[in-house]
């Protein structure tokens, strides 16, 4: 597959985003944030730039932010993002996947090759994803815009907060995004 070929020929760390809705916006925003912080950043995938068109330009210090669709996840073999994110899963593409269970299974493949040192970011408000996060290998970081989390990323008024076991870290105000 295109994603698999690009992953095998590319270098650096991969941040991969999937979900039914919000993939393009999240990928673009994360690409901008990473581009402001790092020198070698590639924003690829379903967002419009083919992953393979940039993979040979990637260096060991590169960061690739990839929007990955369910269609692309169907054929991964070794693809292993350092950070994966599943934003949400709602009924979609059932003409291809036939059942909601199959669609969910394919979306969850984004974590297939992740190890315990990798991270998967999941939407706490999505019951399917909350349950999925209980039984996966990578570290799970939940996010929510509706409630404060004991650990994870949440919205408190207009402030985005990262709460760890030890501290609460203000990340950015929504008006600054």
Predicted regions and their residues:
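Short beta-strand-centered segment that lines the nucleotide-binding/catalytic pocket of NTP-utilizing
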Residues: 3, 39-51
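Hydrophobic anchor at the start of a short beta-strand
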Residues: 14, 39-41, 138-140
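ATP phosphate-binding P-loop of adenylate-forming
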Residues: 13-19, 27-28
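A conserved segment at the C-terminal end of the G1
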Residues: 25-42
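Flexible active-site lid/hinge loop adjacent to a nucleotide/diphosphate
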Residues: 58-142, 146, 154-156, 161, ...
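Short, well-ordered alpha-helices that flank and scaffold nucleotide-derived cofactor binding pockets
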Residues: 31-36, 53-57, 134
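Short, basic phosphate-binding NTP loop
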Residues: 1-16
């Amino acid at each position: 597959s295109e994603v698999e070929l690009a992953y095998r020929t590319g270098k650096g760390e991969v941040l991969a985003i999937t979900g039914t809705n919000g993939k393009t916006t999240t990928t673009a925003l994360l690409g901008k944030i990473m581009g402001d912080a790092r020198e070698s950043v590639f924003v690829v995938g379903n967002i419009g730039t083919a992953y393979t068109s940039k993979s040979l330009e990637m260096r060991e210090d590169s960061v690739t932010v990839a929007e990955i669709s369910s269609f692309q996840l169907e054929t991964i073999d070794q693809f292993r993002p350092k950070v994966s994110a599943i934003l949400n899963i709602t009924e979609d593409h059932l003409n291809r996947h036939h059942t909601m269970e199959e669609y969910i299974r394919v979306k969850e493949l984004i974590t297939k090759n992740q190890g315990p040192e990798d991270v998967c970011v999941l939407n706490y408000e999505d019951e399917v994803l909350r349950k999925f996060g209980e039984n996966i290998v990578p570290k799970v970081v939940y996010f929510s815009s509706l409630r404060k989390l004991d650990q994870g990323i949440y919205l408190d008024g207009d402030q985005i907060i990262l709460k760890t076991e030890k501290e609460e870290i203000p990340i950015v105000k929504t008006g600054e995004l």
